Regions:
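Structural motif
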Residues: 25, 45, 112-114
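Alpha-helix boundary recognition
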Residues: 41-42, 86
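Charged, gly/pro-rich active-site loop segments
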Residues: 57-130
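Acidic-enriched, low-complexity/disordered segments with a strong bias for Aspartate over Glutamate
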Residues: 9, 22, 43, 51-56, ...
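Short beta-strand segments
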Residues: 1-32, 40, 47-52, 61-62
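Short N-terminal helix-initiation segments at or just after the protein's N-terminus
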Residues: 7-15, 45-56, 90-95, 102-105
Length: 130
């Protein structure tokens, strides 16, 4: 997933993150000292995309969303997100687990979703408001 946050100078900053979803709720994590975390502390608005690279432009599909990223503070929800991430990315389980203070977990609940499907027409998207 690529997530764009707003830098202090007003320019968007897009970065790739691992993510997991539970229904429409999306979780991702980052370092609390990262530029992403600093940007989110100042402005919680984000845009994100979930897609995959294809060689045929008419095969482009994906999701583009506008929403806000909220820090997850409740320890049980943090544990839930970490368990979901471990299920989605089992290779993570062989790595040393970070201490709670070494990670920041965020929750995203989409407000506006563009569903991209270029097989219908070049540039086609359906807009859904949640």
């Amino acid at each position: 997933m690529t997530i764009a946050t707003n830098r202090p100078d007003g320019w968007p900053r897009a970065t790739t993150v691992g993510y997991v979803n539970d229904g429409l709720t999306i979780y991702f994590l980052c370092s609390p000292q990262s530029q992403k975390a600093a940007n989110l502390a100042r402005d919680s608005r984000v845009s994100l995309t979930i897609d995959h690279d294809v060689s045929d432009p008419m095969a482009i599909t994906g999701l583009s969303m506008a929403t806000e990223a909220q820090p997850v503070i409740d320890p049980s929800e943090v544990a839930k997100a970490m368990n979901l991430l471990g299920t989605r990315y089992p290779e993570y389980m062989s790595l040393p687990m970070p201490k709670p203070e070494e990670i920041a977990v965020y929750r995203v609940l989409p407000k506006v979703i563009s569903i991209l499907d270029y097989s219908k027409e070049f540039g086609h998207s359906d807009l859904v408001t949640v």
